Amino acid sequence: MLHTLSCSPYHADLDTLLRSLEQGDALVLLQDGVIAALVGGDIIHRLLDSAVLLYALRPDTEARGMTEQISNSVVLIGYNEFVQLTVEHPQQLAW
């Protein structure tokens, strides 16, 4: 399943999101959701413990001036890669 987080992780039900993640799932952080990928934060550690593939939309990190602060464990992707993930994961859940 493809999960997308578009709001700040501080305004999302992160516990429910983490419980719903399963092996083989992917999580794309976009819009204000990219805040979850900041290095050194407790949220990124919780996401990394979930053992799913983590992505952040590069245009959104750039728009917020955060690209250099994104964890190296998060793959920065563009719109084309995002579309490819939607093809690979027909089931999707937006948070």
From Swiss-Prot:
Keywords: Cytoplasm, tRNA processing
Coiled coil regions in record: none
Domain of life: Bacteria
A GO CC term assigned to this protein in UniProt: sulfurtransferase complex
Main location: cytoplasm
Keyword Transmembrane helix: no
Residues passing through the membrane, by range: none
Gene Ontology terms describing biological process: tRNA wobble position uridine thiolation
Record family assignment: Belongs to the DsrH/TusB family.
Assembly: Heterohexamer, formed by a dimer of trimers. The hexameric TusBCD complex contains 2 copies each of TusB, TusC and TusD. The TusBCD complex interacts with TusE.
Protein name per its UniProtKB record: Protein TusB
Protein's organism: Pectobacterium atrosepticum (strain SCRI 1043 / ATCC BAA-672) (Erwinia carotovora subsp. atroseptica)
Gene encoding the protein: tusB
